[in-house]
């Protein structure tokens, strides 16, 4: 069970690293919704890493899984919104969004602008893999994290089943 938390943390680190690669090497600028998703990946990954290090019993595991579900569903909502905007760009208002102004004023954006500064277009769907855009993949991954955390939340640990 512990290894699953480590895998989630490593997947999150890989996804955030790949997002930085797309930004810095390919010039794909992140929009405000992309930054919110990055933050959600950070929160899911750090929570999973803490769960791996802590190796909690049932109550602690449920707390960690609950946080992963919460952060993953928040990320899924944002990714779903962006996936919708990519398909229906006419629904997006031009100009600087309140989210962009808010994000760019956060201390994180000043401390690490490459990671947390938003200056891209939320309707940009140019990058695709297997006919799915980045927000589509992000939505699927966040939902998968929620499902996995839900299954871990419900599961019994091997040690507790041996005690009965």
From Swiss-Prot:
UniProt keyword annotation of Cell inner membrane present: yes
One GO MF term attached to the UniProt entry: electron transfer activity
Membrane topology per record: Multi-pass membrane protein
Transmembrane segments: 5-21, 40-56, 63-80, 137-155
A Pfam family of this chain: DsbB
Location of this chain's protein in the cell: Cell inner membrane
GO biological process: protein folding
Annotated GO CC locations: plasma membrane
Segments on the Periplasmic side according to the record's topology features: 22-39, 81-136
Classification via InterPro entries: DiS_bond_form_DsbB/BdbC, Disulphide_bond_form_DsbB, DsbB, DsbB-like_sf
Cytoplasmic topological domain residue ranges: 1-4, 57-62, 156-164
Family named by the database record: Belongs to the DsbB family.
Described function: Required for disulfide bond formation in some periplasmic proteins. Acts by oxidizing the DsbA protein.
Designated name of the protein: Disulfide bond formation protein B
The species this protein was found in: Nitrosomonas europaea (strain ATCC 19718 / CIP 103999 / KCTC 2705 / NBRC 14298)
